[in-house]
Amino acid sequence: MILGIKSLRYIVVVATIAFGFTGLAQDKTVNDGVFTEALVSAGQVVYDAQCKTCHNMRFYRDTLRSWNNQPLLYLWESIMGTMPADNPGSLMFEEYTDVIAYILSENGFPTGEAELDPDNGMDSIAIVAP
């Protein structure tokens, strides 16, 4: 059976709509409650001990703006690879994740039931400017 041009166009349009909406449904942003209050509490402890000396929340507001529409995982990797400045990568993976949750919370993003995990889904969470 050979498909006509109209049939082929119809299939392409239907497939584009179906797959397009499926893709949109899977995308999350930091506005979607992608971290818990427990992560925020743990992150504040790490932030106060490791970050506060050099970085205030104004710094992070500007940082989040510069990462707008980028995956949250990229910011996590950047912070892990460069901080603390005197010993980059020296914190535990969970501590970097906790700090990210604290930074997001302090910039007005909502908590939720989801646990942030750099190995599971953080690459599909988009940063949006506060």
Predicted regions located by residue number:
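Electrostatic cytochrome c docking/interface patches
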Residues: 24-46, 87
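Bacterial N-terminal signal peptides that target proteins for export
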Residues: 2-12
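Bacterial N-terminal signal peptides
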Residues: 10-20
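Sequence context surrounding c-type heme c attachment/ligation sites in exported
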Residues: 41-49, 61-73, 92-93
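Flexible coil segments in periplasmic/lumen-exposed cytochrome c-class electron-transfer proteins
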Residues: 91-130
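The canonical Cys-X-X-Cys-His
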Residues: 43, 47-57, 99, 103
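Short microdomains enriched in Cys/His and/or Lys/Arg
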Residues: 72-82
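Alpha-helix C-capping/helix-to-loop hinge sites
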Residues: 61, 82-86, 106
